[in-house]
Design a protein with these regions (language model features):
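A general structural signal for well-ordered alpha-helical segments in protein cores
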Residues: 62, 66, 91, 126, ...
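Active-site beta->alpha loop and helix N-cap motifs at the rims of alpha/beta catalytic domains
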Residues: 2-152, 169, 288
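Soluble or luminal CAZymes and related metallo-dependent hydrolases
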Residues: 29, 61, 121, 177, ...
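C-terminal alpha-helical cap/extension of soluble enzyme domains
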Residues: 7, 12-16, 40, 211, ...
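Broad structural signal for hydrophobic residues in well-ordered alpha-helices, predominantly aliphatic
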Residues: 129, 161, 185, 271-272
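Short glycine-enriched loops at secondary-structure junctions
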Residues: 85, 200-202, 274
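Catalytic alpha/beta core domains of metabolic enzymes, predominantly
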Residues: 134, 145-262
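A structural signal for short hydrophobic/aromatic patches embedded in well-ordered alpha helices
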Residues: 65, 161, 299-300
Length: 312
């Protein structure tokens, strides 16, 4: 994974988080999963994002996981850390302690439980972070949070932050599933910031626009397909009539349709438990819950069919 490039480039994986029987992070299995993905050619890892059940882990748990990965030999420059908490102190603590261990890339997004939060309040929140971290060698990415609803990051807040702290933000990460929203951000801000998406089904659209960087949850299970999708903007085959056939696009659509009606994290963890032949991967932290047995059975059959169609 290690490269000399600065910031997010190529395919970064929003890592699923393996848990032990006590629902604590299983650090050894996390390391092994990262090593497996690295062999497949991913560019880096995102820790404690939506697929990593980030909101379920405390600041100290996140710091401990980073430390253990570094001790096992994972490079700090191959990590991007979700550092959003409802409290400024926790966000600052995580960023400062991880940065002291060599990590430079951090993702922050609205984490407000207060329904009275305002644009001015969001600007003040992120401005305080920017002021406290000013002068440090950091890469800060602002991210949307669809769960924030009306209090999500919006163009007004972004514009004010750029006016006040332009040099401190590296890019914008759209965590919505709305391609139009991502394109709106590109039109408004691409001359000032890099614009990325975490929506796997939008990766092809971004690649066709020349953006060959993205954060993927599906890459936990299908890394090779996601790498090809992000790095290519051409159909891989042609029909007998010369018409372009997007084979990888068809495979990605099939994978998406397989799990689209299910909660994403439990579904992906179940698929990974099948792939690794390790039932321990099939654990989530409440308030998430596992898929029921009938859903498991259907998903297993669909995944076997998918793997057969994806085989070279």
């Amino acid at each position: 994974m290690t490269s000399d490039s600065v910031g997010l480039h190529g395919l970064w994986v929003d890592l699923l988080m393996p848990l032990d029987a006590n629902l604590d992070i299983h650090h050894a299995k996390l390391y092994t999963h990262i090593q497996t993905l690295a062999v497949k050619g991913i560019a880096g890892i995102v820790l404690f994002g939506p697929s990593g059940e980030g909101d379920a882990f405390s600041c100290d748990e996140r710091i401990d996981a980073i430390r253990q990965l570094l001790d096992r030999g994972i490079s700090a420059k191959d990590m991007a850390i979700h550092a959003a908490f409802p409290t400024l102190r926790d966000s600052l603590k995580l960023i400062e302690q991880a940065h002291a261990m060599g990590v430079k890339c951090f993702i922050i997004h609205p984490a407000f439980n207060n329904r009275d939060a305002t644009d001015a309040g969001m600007v003040a929140f992120f401005s305080h972070l920017a002021q406290q971290l000013k002068g440090q060698d950091l890469l800060l990415y602002l991210a949307s949070d669809p769960c924030a609803g009306a209090h999500d990051l919006n163009n007004r807040v972004i514009s004010q932050l750029l006016a006040q702290h332009r040099d401190q933000f590296e890019g914008l990460i759209d965590q919505s599933h709305n391609a139009s929203h991502t394109l709106d951000w590109m039109r408004a801000f691409e001359e000032k910031l890099s614009i990325l998406t975490t929506q796997d089904m939008n990766a092809k659209v971004m690649a066709n626009l020349g953006v060959h960087t993205g954060i993927s949850s599906y890459a936990n299970v299908i890394p090779a397909l996601m790498i090809r999708t992000i790095m290519s903007n051409q159909a891989s085959k042609r029909s007998v009539t010369g018409e372009a056939i997007d084979v990888d696009g068809q495979l990605l659509m099939a994978f998406d349709q397989m799990i689209m009606s299910m909660p994403a994290v439990p579904a992906l963890k179940y698929l990974l438990s099948i792939q690794y032949r390790d039932p321990d991967w099939n654990r989530v932290r409440p308030p998430l819950s596992l898929l029921n047995s009938s859903t498991h059975d259907k998903l297993l059959k669909d995944f076997q069919k998918f793997n057969a169609s994806a085989a070279p």
